[in-house]
Amino acid sequence: MESKKTVILDLTDCKYLGELHERIRVAFDFPEWYGANWDAFWDLLRSECDAEKLEIKGINTLSKEFDNQIETMKYVLEMFKNNCKKYDEIFEYEIIS
């Protein structure tokens, strides 16, 4: 049985939006030129992501100032998940903590 490729995104104690995007870039192994914004995240999910599962850790450690950013991230991930379904591809994400 083939195992799913899983990406683990650890946001524990992330303090700045730039740091959040750098952790995304590293977790997904996006290129250095990743634009560090939600449009760039969407673009690279569609073109560079071969993961079938994303586990997100550490959201509960973020300050309230990140609430809107996390909602935007979840929106982009949900769009990507739905886009994958159209092409019979699998992508799911789970917020662990």
Task: Please describe what each predicted stretch is.
Residues 2-97:
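Positively charged, polar, low-complexity stretches
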